[in-house]
Amino acid sequence: MCKIGILFENRDFEHDVYELIKAFYPEAEIHTLYENGEAEYDLRFSVERDNDSYIIKYERTENLSKQETEQKGVISADILSKENAGCGIQDAHALRKENKDNIKYALYQLLVKLTGRTLPWGNLTGIRPAKLAMGMIESGMKNTEAAREMRERYLVSPQKTALAITIANREREILKDIDYENGYSLYIGIPFCPSICLYCSFSSYPLKVWEKRTDEYVEALCREVRETALMMKGRKLDTIYIGGGTPTTLLPHQIRKLLDTVGEAFGYEGLAEFTVEAGRPDSITREKLMAIREYPVTRISVNPQTMNQETLDVIGRRHTVEQTKEAFHLARELGYDNINMDLIVGLPGEDIHMVERTLEQVRELAPDSITVHSLAVKRAARLNIFKEKYQEMSFENNQEIMDLTMKTAYEMGMGPYYLYRQKNMKGNFENVGYAKVDKAGIYNILIMEEKQPIIALGAGGSSKLVFDHGQRIERVENVKDVSNYISRIDEMIERKRTAIATWL
C-alpha cells in the first residue's frame, strides 16, 4: 500500500487538501503531519503560506505509477487577505471560500499531472454539487454561465456539469411552493434492521437483539414527538420522512401508535409529502402496509439494493429477490401509487452485466422512482473494519455503469431530481435520484440543499437548523445508542428545546 504524508504549516484548508489527495489516491494510507519526522513516505506533500500565496511542494521516493516521472515539484496558489481583497468580497466566509477554491484548483492541476488522470467531479470534495449549481442560478447566472463556472473554476467534467445543472433546475421547480423561512421538515428514525448489511455504517441495530425493547423505544420516541411539536408550534410542517434502519421492523400496533402520536401532535393537514421508508422486503407484511395505509402517507420505499441473489447473500441482506417482487406487488395491490426503490452499484463481485440484470427486473416492476447509490465504504462498516477478509472481492463502478443506470431511468420515464456525494465512493461518482413527473422525493431535496430546518427525532437523529438563508447550519444531535436514547430522553428533549429557542 502506498504511504503518503501531508505536512501542514497550519490547519488552514487541511480537510480540503486531504480529501482531494485522497480522491486521487483512494487506496493509499495517508497521514497528516504538523512537524517533520523521521517516518518514510512514498509521497510527501507540504503546505505552507508565503505572504499572499500558499506553496504546495511534493517529493517522492519512488514512482507510484507509470505516468509519474517527476520526483519533486512545487506549485503556488494566490490568496486574498482582508487588506488586498479589492474585488467586492465583503465577508470572511466568502473570502475563505475564494481562497479555498484557488488552493484546490492549483492542487488539482498538480494531482492530474502526477497521476495522469482526472476526476469526474473535478476538484469538488463536498457532497452537494447541485447545491453549488443552484446557488449560481439563484444568484442570477444563466444555465450556460453556471455550467462554464463549474467546468472552468471547479474543473467538473462536461457530463457531470450537465447533470448538476439539470438537477438544480428541476429542484427549483419542485421546491417553488416550499416556504423556507417559516416551514420545516421532520425526520423520525427507527434504528432497527432485520440484519446489518456489510457496507452499513448507520446507527442500525439487529432486531433480534432489541425486539424486547422496541416498545420502550417507541414510547420514548412518542414523547419526543409530543414535546417537539410544542416547540415548533406556529411553524408550518412541510414534509415528514420516517427512515432508519428499517421502519417496518416495528409491529403494526407500534406503527399505529407512532403515526397516531405524530398526527395528534403535529397534524397531517397541508403536508407536501409524507414518506415511510418501508425498506427491507423481509420486514414488509400485508398487515404493516395496511397499518401505514390508514394514514396520509404519500410515498414509500421498497429497497432491494440489488436483484442478484448471490450478492444479497454476500452483503448480509437476508431476503430473496422473490421477496422484493412480492413486497412491491403487495404495495401496489394495497393502493400505493408512489413507490421508490433504492439500488447500489459497486457492490462486491458485481460487474456491469449483473447491474444490467438488476435494472431489467426493476424495469419490469415499474416503480415511480429509483435512487441509485454508488457504494461508499465508511470507517464503521464491517466491509472496512474487516477489509482484509474481503480484499479479494472486486468492487466495480465506472462511468459505463452510471450511464447504464441513467439510460434505464430515462427509458422508464424518469428524470434526475437530486444528487449527493459521499466520501470513499467507488469510482468517485455520485448518488442520483430519478423520478417520474410529480413523484420526486421532496424531503430528499430539502435535506441536500439545506434550504430549511430538518428536525430529527429518534436515536442518532441529527437536526439541522438553518440560519441566514442557509449561510450557517447548526446541528443538534441525539445520542446514537438505543439504550442511552431511552434512558436520556429528557436530556435529548431539553437539548433540542435549547437549540430551537436560539433559532426561533
Mark where each language-model region is:
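A C-terminal junction/extension of Radical SAM enzymes
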Residues: 30, 34, 380-457
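Beta-strand scaffold of nucleotide-dependent catalytic cores
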Residues: 189, 301, 370-374, 444-445, ...
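Canonical Radical SAM [4Fe-4S] cluster-binding loop centered on the CxxxCxxC motif
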Residues: 181-216
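Short beta-strand motif preference
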Residues: 56-58, 188, 302
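Radical SAM enzyme core and accessory elements
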Residues: 1-143, 152, 221, 437-504
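Conserved non-cysteine loop/helix-boundary elements of the Radical SAM core domain that shape
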Residues: 204-404
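N-terminal [4Fe-4S]-dependent radical SAM core
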Residues: 115-118, 138-186
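Key residue(s) within conserved catalytic/signature motifs
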Residues: 166-167, 199, 276
